From Swiss-Prot:
Family, similarity comment: Belongs to the transcription activator-like effector (TALE) family. Bat subfamily.
Keywords: ANK repeat, DNA-binding, Plasmid, Repeat
Species of the source: Mycetohabitans rhizoxinica (strain DSM 19002 / CIP 109453 / HKI 454)
Top-rank taxon: Bacteria
Lineage: Bacteria, Pseudomonadati, Pseudomonadota, Betaproteobacteria, Burkholderiales
Protein name: Burkholderia TALE-like protein 2
Keyword Cell membrane: no
Length: 997
């Protein structure tokens, strides 16, 4: 059984599994549990040859598990010969009816293989049991004739009751089509446990729900909670509406297993939760998961005790707001003191508890942490691996497999990255099974880590292994295949690319577009395929469609755009703003919420651009509703609309606003000003950053960090992790001679925590290559610096051979996107050299944020610009600033019109040769005529655009008349605006005038 045999390090001792009391109870409570324990005891040696301890426990946690374990021993060798990995076999066996499923896989897999189903498909279908496998064999061809793809059939079949769901689709699909449900909707409804009943219930209740304003998309989502959920919405929706819950909330709560019970619990418990200070958003979050009803009850029971231990309400909401939230809260209460004794912070405990299986993860950390520490894993690593669904299994797998990974050349950070996602345990096993074969195909270790380092990484790796040759034949290169696979649901996306790529290609979508849409998953590809003709008729171009589809929930976002676009147009939203709001994860919900709350926000003084900014991020729907709820209180506390928009207008904006409301008094007591609070809250993860500052600030102060230092480190994406990393790693940095300002510079960027870790790891190697400490800090002190440091080590020697010195390499690497810039220099340097650009030119172009894109733009547009009279110096000047690529494109696009309006080449170069040059040119094009009517000369406009930029031009346009009425001359206005920060200077002039009046 070569594919499933264990490595020597993985084998269990012959003394048995040494089950803990908790593990024994977990097995015994299942039907046939006693027989399972006896089987494990009697057959331990045989099982240990093919399964790890974690595998045995997984299979044993179901009814009749003894038969499933016996089936593994019987079928495992043959399945191994057919190419099934150990993880596949465990997955098939680890369900109710696992024994029959294994025997059926042996029976039907050859036929399914001939019909185009992959091994990944077979494993997934087997999750619906033996009957599902046989039903796919029987009615799969008919469903195929009706237009259902192989991926659709697998999705429907691979759940409890999959066989019945397939039969129901066959029977009910024509009627559902008549009612306006498309193929994607039908697959979504059927593709859950109890899918057959859900399809029937949709037919029964859809007319009534439709009359109440629920869309087809809404009904399909509610059906994810099963037939009962649909009936519950019908019964309870009027009362919930009276209590202030809007349709989006109701859909969210109902659309999960147990959705009916969750809706009832919200109705029963909402008033008590409100009395305790929980907001409507909190209640919705806790209720909107499997077991939501139990979670709400547990919060009511346990919240006082958790608050006494120092957990905040946001912490409690976060821990309760996942499947199994009730158990997680109880586990935190039981185990928190033991964690504190071992040095885990409150933030660590919350992170580990706040996932599916959080209770088991906490238990596993307590049990395995000493052994992991002995192997060199830090507390931060342990928290990262445990802090995902399936964290307990991931920790056990790391302990079992780490030595083998080390022998194969994987570093500790790579092991942590692969293990630190949903399904991390399976990912590690799959890498061990397939890594050698990938190496033979030329796939780099970094690519393997990238593919596996996402939710569902094991399946993605398996799919790449199987489909890569076919994708290569279609023209996809290794980089694009890795990119498609390296997202949650990567396996399904790869299969869908094969299905729909030929047609999308004919419709004008490029390979790059298809890869981007695949970032929204398989469903996004199929929905783009289905809706693109209609969206085109409405004026949306392929770029718009790609932007909307290429995110989580992209399929739903496309549907929502189709449904809501007319209503949004009536409200004054244009196509660009609709695309912006829809073009993020959760875009569909954002559009619905804009329609819902926009009038109320307008009454409160929020402009359309501000509403778009709040809505146009991940979680935009929640952010809009939270602004509506909290704005009056925040306003009373001195936060103005600009502050609120800034905080809310990021992914996680709703949570950030909630955190500001709760934590602001404590910050004020510690001397933080309002701008400090806004800066820390106004990033992705702002809520966590605020919490981390309150928790860690005293310790950081003791180490000599000032309040501005703390704000700078916390005020970026990942600020909470950066502060934690500074606290943990600062002594090591001090020992190596880094100053406090060095540490702050490295930590004070996106990904600061990873940058600190990378510096400690890579600094010795960089020193050997003659890079100084100042160089290392310079490279590390930017967004994306971890990759930049690694790229310097990887590409530095070749760049040196081509004549680039140390200072040049540091300049190129020491900007946002430095890693990509170094790679671009290697790739495009020879071509640029042939075209007359010297090394100094190349360094200037590449040595800015977005340097890689600038180099590509020079290659692409340089010849045309030269034909239009621009020389090499002009091109270097325009490309060699942040946003250089956009500047070159803008010159190419707008140059002829600007020439017609009297601007010469020197003017255009001057305006384009600054950060934001593209925007400056567009603004001159748009507003230049108006400014000319106000007696500003071409020279004035060029002066303002090339120094103050687009914002300064707009400020002059807006406030110029006011200033002129007050007696200020054009000459004075131009003098103030034509400087860096000119827009702010103009606004200050106006403010001073108003104060005097």
């Amino acid at each position: 059984m070569p594919a499933t045999s264990m490595h020597q390090e993985d084998k269990q001792s012959a003394n048995g599994l040494n089950l803990s009391p908790l593990e024994r109870i977990k097995i015994e409570k299942h039907y046939g549990g006693g027989a399972t324990l006896a089987f494990i005891s009697n057959q331990h040696d045989e099982l240990a040859q093919v399964l790890s301890r974690a595998d045995i426990l997984k299979i044993a946690s179901y009814d009749c598990a003894a038969q499933a374990l016996q089936a593994v021993l019987d079928c495992g060798p043959m399945l191994g010969k057919r190419g099934f990995s150990r993880a596949d076999i465990v997955r098939i066996a680890g369900n109710g009816g696992g024994a029959q499923a294994l025997y059926s896989v042996l029976d039907v897999e050859p036929t399914l293989g001939k019909r185009g189903f992959s091994q990944v498909d077979v494993v997934k279908i087997a999750g619906g049991g033996a009957q599902a496998l046989h039903t796919v064999l029987e009615i799969g061809p008919t469903l195929g004739e009706r237009g259902f793809s192989r991926g659709d059939i697998v999705t429907i079949a691979g759940n409890n009751g999959g066989a019945q769901a397939l039969q129901a689709v066959l029977e009910l699909e024509p009627t559902l089509r008549e009612r306006g449900f498309n193929q994607a909707d039908i697959v979504k409804i059927a593709g859950n446990g109890g899918g057959a009943q859900a399809l029937q219930a949709v037919l029964d209740v859809e007319p009534a729900l439709g009359k109440r304003g629920f869309s087809r998309v809404d009904i399909a989502k509610i059906a994810g909670g099963g037939a009962q959920a649909l009936q519950a919405v019908l019964g309870l929706e009027p009362t919930l509406r009276k209590r202030g819950f809007h349709p989006t909330d109701i859909i969210k709560i109902a659309g999960n297993n147990g959705g009916a019970q969750a809706l009832q619990a919200v109705l029963d418990l909402e008033l008590m939760l409100r009395e305790r200070g929980f907001s409507q958003a909190d209640i919705v979050k806790m209720a909107s998961n499997i077991g939501g009803a139990q979670a709400l009850q547990a919060v009511l029971n346990l919240e006082p005790a958790l608050c006494e231990r120092g957990f905040s309400q946001p912490d409690i909401v976060k821990m309760a707001g996942n499947s199994g939230g009730a158990q997680a809260l109880q586990a935190v209460l039981d185990l928190e003191l033991a964690f504190r004794e071992r040095g885990f912070s409150q933030a660590d405990i919350v992170k580990m508890a706040s996932n599916i299986g959080g209770a088991q993860a906490l238990q596993a950390v307590l049990e395995l942490e000493p052994a992991l520490h002995e192997r060199g894993f830090s507390q931060a690593n342990i928290v990262k691996m445990a802090g995902n669904s399936g964290g307990a299994q991931a920790l056990q797998a790391v302990l079992d497999l780490e030595l083998v990974f080390r022998e194969r050349g994987f570093s500790q950070p790579e092991i942590v990255e692969m293990a630190g996602n949903i399904g991390g345990a399976q990912a590690l096993h799959t890498v061990l099974d397939l890594e050698l074969a990938f190496r033979e195909r030329g796939v780099r270790q970094a690519d393997i880590v990238k593919i596996v380092g996402n939710n569902g990484g094991a399946q993605a790796l398996q799919a790449v292994f199987e489909l890569e040759p076919t994708l290569r034949e279609r023209g996809f290169n290794q980089a694009t295949i890795v990119k498609i696979a390296a997202n949650g649901g990567g396996a399904q996306a790869l299969y869908s690319v094969l299905d729909v790529e030929p047609t999308l290609d004919k419709r004008g979508f490029s390979r790059v577009d298809i890869v981007k849409i695949a970032g929204g998953g398989a469903q996004a590809l199929h929905t783009a395929f289905e809706l693109e003709p209609t969206l085109r008729k409405r004026g949306f171009n392929p770029t718009d469609i790609v932007k909307i589809a290429g995110n989580k929930g992209g399929a739903q976002a496309l549907q929502a755009v189709l449904e809501l676009e007319p209503a949004l147009r009536e409200r004054g939203f244009n196509q660009a703003t609709i695309v912006k709001m829809a073009g993020n994860a959760g875009g569909a919900q954002a559009l619905y919420s804009v329609l819902d709350v926009e009038p109320a926000l307008r009454e409160r003084g929020f402009s359309q651009p501000e509403i778009v900014k709040i809505a146009g991020n991940i979680g935009g729907a929640q952010a809009l509703h939270t602004v509506l709820e909290l704005e009056p209180t925040l306003h009373k506390r001195g936060f103005n609309p600009t502050d609120i928009v800034k905080i809310a207008g990021n992914s996680g904006g709703a949570q950030a606003l909630q955190a500001v409301l709760e934590l602001e008094p404590a910050f004020r007591e510690r001397g933080f000003g309002q701008p400090d609070i806004v800066k820390m809250a106004s990033n992705i993860g702002g809520a966590q950053a605020l919490q981390a500052v309150l928790e860690l600030e005293p310790a950081l102060r003791e180490r000599g960090f000032s309040q501005p230092d703390i704000v700078e480190m916390a005020g970026n994406i990942g600020g909470a992790q950066a502060l934690q990393a500074v606290l943990e790693l600062e002594p090591a940095f001090r020992e190596r001679g880094f100053s406090q300002s060095d540490i702050v510079k490295i930590a004070g960027n996106i990904g600061g925590a990873q940058a600190l870790q990378a510096v400690l790891e890579l600094e010795p190697t960089l020193r050997e290559s003659d890079f100084r400490q100042a160089d290392i800090v310079n490279i590390a002190g930017n967004d994306g610096s971890t990759q930049a440091l690694k790229a310097v080590i990887e590409h530095g020697p070749r760049l040196r051979q081509r004549g680039f010195n140390r200072a040049s390499i540091v300049k190129i690497a020491g900007n946002s996107g430095g890693a990509q810039a170094l790679q671009a220099v290697l790739k495009h340097g020879p071509t640029l050299d042939e075209r007359g650009f010297n090394l100094t030119n190349i360094v200037k172009i590449a040595g800015n944020g977005g340097g890689a894109q600038a180099l590509k733009a020079v290659i692409e547009h340089g010849p045309t610009l030269q034909q239009r009279g621009f020389n090499l110096t002009d091109i270097v000047e325009m490309a060699g600033k942040g946003g250089g690529a956009q500047a070159l494109k803008a010159v190419l696009e707008h140059g002829p019109t600007l020439r017609q309006r009297g601007f010469n080449l020197i003017d255009i170069v001057e305006m384009a040769s600054n950060t934001g040059g593209a925007q400056a040119l567009k603004t001159v094009l748009e507003h230049g005529p108006t400014l000319r009517q106000r007696d500003l000369s071409l020279i004035d406009i060029v002066e303002i655009a090339s120094n103050g930029g687009a914002q300064a031009l707009k400020a002059v346009l807006k406030y110029g008349p006011v200033l002129m009425q007050a007696g200020r001359s054009n000459e004075e206005i131009v003098h103030v605006a034509a400087r860096r920060g000119g827009a702010g200077r103009i606004r200050k002039m106006v403010a001073l005038l108003l104060e005097r009046q």
